[in-house]
Structures are given as C-alpha cells and as structure tokens.
C-alpha cells in the first residue's frame, strides 16, 4: 500500500463508505479504486484528486496533504540519472536492489537524511 492509498482508506473508514460506494460516486470502477489504494496503479490524475477531496469535503490543508501524498506514491518510480556522475547511478541501483530488505528504522533514517539535504541546497 502507498501513503496515498493508506490516506484514502482512512478517509473512507472515517466516512464509513465502501470502495464500491466511493467508486460509484467518483465515476471509477471499484477495481481501479482498489488498485489505487493498494499501490498497483500509478498516481491519480489531478482531476481525480480534486474529486476525491470534494467527495470527502476535506479542508484545503488536508487536500493539499492528500495531493502531496499522491505525488510521492507512484509504486513504479523511475529515477533518471542521465547526466549525473556515475556514483549517483550506482547509489540509485544499490537502493533499488536493497529497498525490500530495509526495515522501518532504516527507511526513517534515510528519509531524514534526504529531508535535511533538501534544506541545505
């Protein structure tokens, strides 16, 4: 499950609706909504994100967070390292090869490193 999928599932639970009910209201298939929640589809379109925010009648801050989660929830991300130094390509490939074996603590630590690196540059 992706961060976006988890957020949508929580919103559905809070509203007390099934995937089938939500899918009908959004004019998508229940299978598509299920795949979106489970990270088996790419990121939703901006139009669908707006419909989801409207369906749950969420405030702007919560909608903005949902949009951000969607942006970081593509389960099949491609990292383009063309034009970068060889060590960047090697790093991305090592991460891809080992990501399934990393525990939550290590993921948290790596996330903090990335967050702090963004503040420096």
What are these regions (language model features)?
Residues 1-14, 98, 109:
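A short, Lys/Arg-rich alpha-helix, primarily the initiator
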Residues 8, 12, 22-23, 33-36:
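Conserved hydrophobic/aromatic packing and binding residues within compact polymer-binding modules
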Residues 27-43, 51:
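Recognition helix of helix-turn-helix/homeodomain-like DNA-binding domains
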Residues 47-65:
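DNA major-groove recognition helix of helix-turn-helix/homeodomain DNA-binding modules
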Residues 64-97:
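Short, charged recognition helix plus adjacent turn
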Residues 100-121:
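Mid-protein regulatory/catalytic core that forms ligand/cofactor-binding pockets
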